[in-house]
Amino acid sequence: MMQMSDKFNYEELGLKVGLEIHRQLDTKKLFSPVPTKFSDEVDFTFQRRLRPTMSELGEVDPAALEEFKKGRVFIYEGNYQLTDLVYMDEEPPRGPDKEALEVALQIAYLLNAKPVDEVYYMRKIVIDGSNVSGFQRTAIIATDGKVETPWGTVGIPTICLEEDAARIIERKEKEVIYRLDRLGVPLVEISTTPDIHHPEQAKVVAKFIGDALRATRKVKRGLGTIRQDLNVSIKGGARIEIKGVQELDMIPLIIEREVERQLNLLKIRDELQRRGVRPEDIKEEFYDVTDVFTNTKSKIIARAIKKGGKVLAIKLPKFRGLIGREIQPGRRLGTEFADRARKYVPGIFHIDELPNYGITQEEVNEVIKRLGLGEEDAFVLVAAEEERAKNALREVIKRAKEAIIGVPEETRRALPDGNTEYMRPLPGKARMYPETDIPPIRIPDELKRKIKENLPELPQVKVEKYVREYKLDRSLAQTLVDDERDELFEELVQMGVKPSLAASILVVVLKGLRKEVPIENISDEHIKEAFSLYLEGKIAKEAFEEIFKEIARNPNKTARQIAEEKGLTLLSEDEVRKIIDEVIEQNIEVVKNKGMGAMGLIMGRVMAKVRGKADGKLVSQIVKKRLQEIVGGGV
């Protein structure tokens, strides 16, 4: 289904997209009875080095091997309340957590999937330090789910229940610090088939899955609790895994940018092949051109030489004019080279961007002469300690050879602007082997039946209900559900609050405060207490905004305390009448001249005195009545 606004004809390009959505569950840890809370309190630390192991087939995963080559030491910070021996890898796992398993089954049914009869846990090799054990435990909970979209059906082949990784605190050159509070938080992983053929379709599928997850009321909320990964490919291109897409609305743009990147890489490939270059033409030959830059004005190069480093160059035959070619807005083939080299050096220089960065045309000409470059040939420079410079240039050579072949398969990181950058090679299948510490878990038919018969409402069903039963505006109802305020809304309505008022305060008032104060400090209990005061006649609805502002700044205070301290408790009707009479007396000449036309002026001045302390409707009624009495009942 092509749309008029499409940048590309995705059908012609053979676009295929698959989603992987991970969401934290709000239960205990998956294999220990430890709370899943986060804390900055550190009671102890320990360190580990991790090494790759072979799979059942005797193979080593390429992504794990690349991580190992970095030679990093991992420091782990723990808290006695939030970490136990299981997640220090000093004790066998327990569980899995019964509640987490039941929530995963709920999600499976909401996504039209079929739960398995027995759950078998596997170990997935992960040696970037985020798992102390060097592996992540994961199991398939259900298969054969589906999502219906206007473009067609998208399959959900697997729904898994696995452990989340440790929280990264600091990354240094040879050391990474992790905190263990997040390690072991249950994570549901939902994978779709690559049957998504349009960027907007991917967004629709992701939203439906997100709605099903939220419907359980057992998923965590907030930044980092959901991670969306995309697998994107086009005809002639390659499968690219894009990690860490945080925002739903960014999904179409990220897919569009990846399509653009692959198309441009294919154009570069075609041009390189037209020029007659082959991968074997790129030699691992390093040219020491340090003396060319003895008096350079480039601060980066001068600093490297001063530290005892060297300036090394490589020759890339037939690449001139292509390294600087844009492949995504603001990113070039040279950026791809730099991404690969970054594990060894902060950056690289290439011929298409020079002279620049303090490097003169004379220095460029001398490097061209030293390397014996032809008109179509290019060079790449690195200034660093010799071995680091060589390793960085080896990465550039590898990526340049891939450019001649086409689009390399790899895992990339989503960037805030919709572009992506290189992370690591695409993981192979050689990273899984059986978990020997956890026996198979049989799922009783009775449990399946009970869960299936008591499924929660999907968000869209709730929106329709709120519009129909509570007469809410559709956009207000949708926002209420999207912001996950619907459960609190229903509690407030059960307390006796008018649905329109409850929805307005939760959506309009609280959202309006977001730019002024940290509204995440306002808990559901704070909100319910404020509404209790309103129902008791202690505060006016105009007081909510001021009370919530103060709670956001001082979350340890109660709504009642703030109402009393700020003088927001409701005035009696007699007190309101007295203030109205005072205001009318102060403006009696205006009242005599304008009659009922003075209503707006009097209301404004009264409300300036009683806002938050009196109901606006009551004030309006009394003002109108008093003015009618004064002007002889005129309207």
Swiss-Prot record:
Catalytic activity: L-glutamyl-tRNA(Gln) + L-glutamine + ATP + H2O = L-glutaminyl-tRNA(Gln) + L-glutamate + ADP + phosphate + H(+)
Region Disordered: start-end pairs: 415-437
Function summary: Allows the formation of correctly charged Gln-tRNA(Gln) through the transamidation of misacylated Glu-tRNA(Gln) in organisms which lack glutaminyl-tRNA synthetase. The reaction takes place in the presence of glutamine and ATP through an activated gamma-phospho-Glu-tRNA(Gln). The GatDE system is specific for glutamate and does not act on aspartate.
GO CC, any one term: cytoplasm
GO biological process: glutaminyl-tRNAGln biosynthesis via transamidation; translation
Family as reported in the entry's similarity comment: Belongs to the GatB/GatE family. GatE subfamily.
InterPro entries registered for this protein in UniProt: Asn/Gln-tRNA_amidoTrfase_suB/E (IPR017959), Asn/Gln-tRNA_Trfase_suB/E_cat (IPR006075), Asn/Gln_amidotransferase (IPR018027), Asn/Gln_tRNA_amidoTrase-B-like (IPR003789), GAD-like_sf (IPR004115), GAD_dom (IPR029351), GatB_C_1 (IPR042114), GatB_Yqey_C_2 (IPR023168)
SMART domains: GatB_Yqey (SM00845)
Its EC number(s): 6.3.5.-
Lineage: Archaea, Methanobacteriati, Methanobacteriota, Thermococci, Thermococcales
Protein name: Glutamyl-tRNA(Gln) amidotransferase subunit E
Subunit structure: Heterodimer of GatD and GatE.
